[in-house]
Amino acid sequence: MTLTAPPRLLLVHAHPDDESLWTGGTIARYAADGVQVTVVTCTLGEEGEIIPPALRELAADAADQLGGYRVAELRAACAALGVTDHRFLGGHGRWRDSGMVGTAANAHPRAFVAGSAQEQADELLAIINAVKPQVVVTYDGFGGYGHPDHIRAHEITTAAVAASSVVERLFHTVTSREETEAGARELAELADLPFRLPEPGELPAVDDAVITTTIDVSEHLMAKLRALRAHTTQVTVWQDGAGGASYALSNGIAQPVLPNEHYVLASGPAEGAERDLFGGLGG
């Protein structure tokens, strides 16, 4: 990094756990380097599927208390990653998890996708103007895997960054197909893996040709795993004690813990961004 001003990174995520799943290593790396990291979460994740049987009465179709529980999970995950500035867009519970495409949750009065995109973008712009990040991260136009809240997060972040005079780069977080497939092959060699191995093409990933930026997070994987463990309702983490590790969501599909996290530069100067979100800025 060659910035003359203190570097500031802002990440916009849809639900608690997305910050750890998609960008946990990146957050931990930059936080450890002294970068001011701000995480903005758009909903409480009220519609998430719950893994531990003892907690399933928190579900949206039962007590509907999952969102509050996930606030505490997110707080613990942020602590594991070194984040000291976390904010909910519009405040706690302003917008609700919309659920997957075609579900009744899409029409909830507080559903994120049912809300005003302009109001949401304005709320985010206010945070951007307060924090003044040089770099902002969110999802691509498909939201990584098509979740309506991820797509809306992409839309409002794109709008807010376009209206901002302080953001120098906008990145989309993506997953490398080559590294994901290599990681899956390594998982197949592990004994006692408690999850189902992914089928070819089953895990969300993009062609490596579109990736512009690769961030080495190999020294921060333990922090990422601690953050993932904090999301106990959503993620199961497995480690074999010999360096092997994997995690799974409620579908029980094994996902590799990759040494790099990948991004596509959506706007801003490309020079220097290949290995550092801030590379070449301010020089």
Curated annotation (Swiss-Prot):
Annotated catalysed reactions: 1D-myo-inositol 2-acetamido-2-deoxy-alpha-D-glucopyranoside + H2O = 1D-myo-inositol 2-amino-2-deoxy-alpha-D-glucopyranoside + acetate
Cofactor(s) this protein cannot do without: Zn(2+)
Natural source organism: Actinosynnema mirum (strain ATCC 29888 / DSM 43827 / JCM 3225 / NBRC 14064 / NCIMB 13271 / NRRL B-12336 / IMRU 3971 / 101)
One example of a Gene Ontology biological process annotation: mycothiol biosynthetic process
Family, per entry: Belongs to the MshB deacetylase family.
Binding site for Zn(2+): H15, D18, H150
HAMAP family: MshB
Protein task: Catalyzes the deacetylation of 1D-myo-inositol 2-acetamido-2-deoxy-alpha-D-glucopyranoside (GlcNAc-Ins) in the mycothiol biosynthesis pathway.
InterPro entries in the record: GlcNAc_PI_deacetylase-related (IPR003737), LmbE-like_dom_sf (IPR024078), Mycothiol_biosynthesis_MshB (IPR017810)
Pfam families, per database record: PIG-L (PF02585)
Protein name per UniProt: 1D-myo-inositol 2-acetamido-2-deoxy-alpha-D-glucopyranoside deacetylase
UniProt key word rRNA processing: no
Classification lineage: Bacteria, Bacillati, Actinomycetota, Actinomycetes, Pseudonocardiales
EC number per UniProt: 3.5.1.103
Top enzyme category: hydrolase
Cofactor-binding details, from the entry: Binds 1 zinc ion per subunit.
Sorted UniProt keywords: Hydrolase, Metal-binding, Zinc
UniProt keyword annotation of Hydrolase present: yes
GO molecular function per UniProt: N-acetylglucosaminylinositol deacetylase activity; zinc ion binding
